[in-house]
UniProtKB/Swiss-Prot annotation:
Keywords: Cell outer membrane, Cell wall biogenesis/degradation, Glycosidase, Hydrolase, Lipoprotein, Membrane, Palmitate, Signal. It is an enzyme of class 3 (hydrolase). It holds the Pfam family GHL10. Divisome-localized glycosyl hydrolase that cleaves peptide-free (denuded) peptidoglycans. It is found in: Cell outer membrane. Coiled coil: none annotated. One of its GO terms (cellular component) is cell outer membrane. It is a lipid-anchor. The gene is digH. This is Glycosyl hydrolase DigH. The keyword Signal applies.
Length: 439
């Protein structure tokens, strides 16, 4: 995400997959069995899941930096039982609110960085629950979310940030990561220091290292094999650089990039390989689990590529080295959810222009299209996007939802993000959503 960015059927699992999973889940090492993450040579793209007749009405629920959940104050509660109770009640209250609004799918951030919101054999516990990396919060947040959402008839997609290890590189963060050395599992920061790079003022994994791709895939496999998630989603954080903090992967490129005409092509191939591995792995474990990506709204601008959109925005292909259009065409995704975070009047990246462009991309494919919209902008003063302030942002929101409903290629909408449903400036828009979607 752009922050600080199924049908439930019993899958028929092959014995070989079960054996591989047993090896993976019983091991405390961070290196997965090769059979879990490498699709067989010449394998076909995975079959897509069947679409529900009900439109997607989704919400992103971010846990990184405790943006949406758990409550920031809960980490200060010293009694583990009381702390867990407060966090669980906060989740229940949120789901009740979402249900009243007509939200039917929650995209729950289970891997915000190099830690987990479930008892993983590969990642340490997230510090978001207790304030300390590796400390058991006394319950399983992912299972709790699944239980509570499913009893309300809502689906849950496990949202992963694939490469991020930390949200900053401060000395205190380094001390926390190093402190996990004696834990099991320890942070990837100390287990595989040679995989770690600095990019965008964060510690990240080097996407060009094949073992990194396999390791990330094993984490997804762990969740899909152990939990009744309805889907898996990767956000837009692939290669994430900032002007003052570029990813130094020159050595990795020299080692692995010899077959490519440029470093940019090599980087795009790295993200392509990860998406393909994850896609095939999910379908080999539970074919009914959806796999999707939520990239930046612009694939490429027409000024750089005749196939691109009539826009002038930061392009996923060129900035994040994510050829998202290709992933759709190759059938690697059940759905794609581009973040079209601009109003109709934003000439550099008009909402309607991008929504229609993506509709044309998915039209000849089996990939579904959900549109991510910028609910976080509703009611916020902006000189370049004043539309979000007019009548509480309701007219702009209505236009976007009307277009999504009018284009048959668009199968739903996802709002970014949950906590903005509770802000004073969005309440007119929330009331409108309830009248439009709610029961």
């Amino acid at each position: 995400m752009d922050i600080c960015s199924r049908n439930e059927k019993l899958a028929i699992r092959r014995p070989a997959i079960l054996v591989a999973l047993a090896l993976l889940l019983c091991s405390c090492k961070s290196t997965p069995p090769e059979s879990m993450v490498t699709p067989p040579a010449g394998s076909k793209p995975p079959a897509t899941t069947q679409q529900s007749s009900q439109p997607m009405r989704g919400i992103w629920l971010a846990t990184v930096s405790r943006l949406d959940w758990p409550p920031v104050s809960s980490v200060n509660i010293s009694n583990p039982t009381s702390r867990a109770r407060v966090q669980q009640q906060a989740m229940i209250d949120k789901l009740d609110h979402l249900q009243r609004l007509g939200i039917n799918t929650v995209f729950f951030q289970v891997k915000p960085d190099g830690t987990a919101l479930w008892p993983s054999k590969i990642l340490p516990w997230s510090d978001l629950m207790t304030g300390k990396i590796g400390e058991n919060p006394g319950y399983d947040p992912l299972q709790f979310m699944l239980d509570e959402a499913h009893k309300r008839g809502m689906k849950v997609h496990a949202w992963f940030n694939p490469y991020r290890v930390s949200v900053n590189t401060k000395p205190g963060t380094i001390r926390e990561l190093n402190s996990t050395l004696s834990q099991q599992p320890a942070s990837v920061y100390v287990q595989h220091r040679d995989w770690i790079r600095t990019s965008g003022d964060r510690f990240v994994l080097d996407p060009g290292i094949p073992e990194v791709q396999d390791w990330i895939t094993s984490i997804v496999a762990e969740v899909v094999s152990r939990y009744p998630v309805d889907g898996v989603q990767f956000d837009d954080y692939f290669y994430t650089e900032s002007p003052g903090s570029r990813l130094n992967d020159n050595e990795t490129y020299r080692k692995y990039g010899g077959a490519f005409a440029s470093k940019a092509d090599w980087r795009r191939n790295n993200t392509q390989q990860l998406i393909a591995k994850v896609s095939h792995t999910i379908k080999s474990i539970k074919p009914e689990v959806e796999f999707g990506v939520s990239p930046a709204g612009v694939w490429r601008n027409r000024s750089h590529d005749p196939l691109g959109s009539d826009t002038r925005g930061a392009a996923a292909y060129d900035e994040s080295y994510a050829d998202t259009r290709r992933w759709v065409e190759q059938g690697l995704l059940d759905y794609i959810a581009p973040q079209i975070y601009w109003p109709f009047s934003r000439s550099a990246a008009r909402y309607d222009v991008l929504a229609k462009w993506w509709a044309d991309v998915v039209k000849p494919t089996r990939t579904r299209l959900y549109i991510g919209i910028a609910f976080y902008k509703v009611g916020e003063p902006s000189k370049i996007e004043p539309d979000w302030m007019i009548n509480g942002g309701v007219p702009e929101l209505k236009k976007q939802l009307d277009l999504n409903d009018a284009l048959p290629e668009i199968s739903g909408t996802i709002l970014f993000r949950e906590d903005y449903l509770n802000k004073p400036q969005t309440q007119q828009a929330v009331s409108y959503l309830q009248s439009r979607w709610g029961s």
